[in-house]
Regions:
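Phosphate/nucleotide-binding beta-alpha loop and adjacent structural elements of enzyme active sites
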Residues: 1-249
Length: 249
């Protein structure tokens, strides 16, 4: 997920519209044929009181969040990447990082696979056989990615992490989840916290990229039970989708 790249160049359009200058989003970049960011994605960030970002990596979106004046909680599982994340957040007073692997339940020994692409596709799941055999491609692009190492980590639920650290979760009512196939596990561990969430951006897959990993239909079915509805079904096999709680004005 690269929210920074998708949003950075379009924030000016949002604020011009907000102040009464009518600018329309084009559907495609005519040179690269890449869809522009959804208006709703920017709107969710703008309307939120604060942001909970699960699967932080190095926190590349920190500048956007800071520019919007948002408090942010970052959660990253990879110990090595987490140390770099902490350094990147030093100058951001209202952004705080926690090192934790989130799961549906507390566990002492969870496999965590480290990917070759700067750990960006690291997951509690290994890649599927179809992906390893080059039968599946992220967004139909050939990418030479593999899991190059495996470590053991302790796992926590989001609800436990919130309680343990006395986080006022109602202040962080837009969530970003980027956990490479573990979306359903993370959500199952947030039964209490999710009641105070208004909107969620989730990176989902529609195909089996990760062995035993969740897919869009799994995430959609789960969130429907908590009164969240997807704004638009995914068009590609691996992309961000936005869920908004139905009773939000």
């Amino acid at each position: 997920m690269n929210i920074l790249k998708k949003i950075r160049s379009h924030l000016r359009y949002f604020f011009l519209n907000f102040f009464g200058v009518d600018i329309k989003f084009v559907k495609k970049n005519i040179f690269k044929n890449i869809e522009t960011p959804e208006y709703e994605s920017i709107n969710c960030l703008y309307r939120s009181q604060g942001i909970l970002h699960i699967g932080a990596h190095r926190g590349s979106e920190r500048y956007v969040y800071d520019w919007l004046g948002k408090e942010v909680i970052w959660i990253e599982a990879n110990p090595t990447i987490f140390n770099e994340l902490k350094k990147n957040l030093v100058e951001f007073k209202y952004q705080k990082a926690y090192k934790a692997l989130l799961h549906s339940k507390k566990r002492d020994d969870v496999d965590f696979f480290l990917s070759s692409n700067d750990n960006a596709s690291s997951s509690i799941y290994d890649f599927s056989k179809d992906f390893k055999d080059n039968k599946l491609f992220f967004q139909n692009k050939i990418r030479n990615i593999s899991m190059i190492n495996k470590i053991k980590l302790k796992a926590y639920t989001l609800d436990d992490l919130i309680l343990k650290n006395s986080i006022d979760i109602k202040k962080f009512n837009h969530w970003v989840i980027d956990v490479q196939g573990a979306e359903l596990e993370v959500l199952k561990g947030s039964i209490e916290s999710i009641k105070l969430c208004n909107s969620i951006t989730v990176e989902v897959s529609t195909e089996n990229f990760y062995k035993e990993g969740s897919k869009f239909n799994d995430v959609n079915e789960f969130l429907n039970k908590f009164n969240f509805k997807v704004t638009k079904d995914p068009k590609r096999n691996h992309e961000d989708v936005i869920f908004i709680r139905n009773d939000i004005n």
